[in-house]
């Protein structure tokens, strides 16, 4: 709380399939409706951690899919404190993208496809339902 300068734990991000850690480093989020936050993009926890702890000279030479940037569309309900996985979409595999919500159309702007390679692509999808 801003006045008391105290934070509380709201919970944790859901793990990836197989139980791997999820990170949202480089991801982006936006409010949706009166009780939801949409979370998209970001780097892969294991790939990013390994690159920091054990740098390899060929790290930047891999194809984009090797980096396993997050393709998940996650929704967090601020009332129930529950995460819902709304699907996987290749268009969301970005780090450092911008995001906007216009009349339930979510727009993803630019971002990195892999370390050092940015895209000028702008992708949009219509959000058909949210709690």
Give each language-model segment a name.
Residues 1-131:
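Kelch-like beta-propeller repeat domains
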């Amino acid at each position: 709380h801003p006045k008391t300068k105290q934070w509380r734990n709201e919970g944790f991000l859901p793990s990836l399939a197989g139980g791997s850690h999820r990170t949202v480093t480089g991801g982006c989020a936006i409010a949706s409706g009166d009780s939801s936050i949409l979370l998209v993009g970001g780097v892969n926890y294991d790939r990013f951690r390994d690159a920091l702890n054990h740098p390899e000279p060929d790290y930047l030479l891999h194809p984009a899919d090797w980096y396993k940037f997050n393709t998940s569309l996650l929704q967090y309900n601020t009332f129930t404190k529950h995460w819902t996985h709304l699907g996987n979409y290749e268009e969301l595999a970005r780090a450092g993208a911008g995001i906007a919500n216009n009349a339930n159309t979510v727009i993803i702007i630019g971002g990195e496809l892999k370390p050092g390679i940015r895209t000028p692509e702008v992708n949009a999808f219509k959000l058909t339902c949210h709690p």
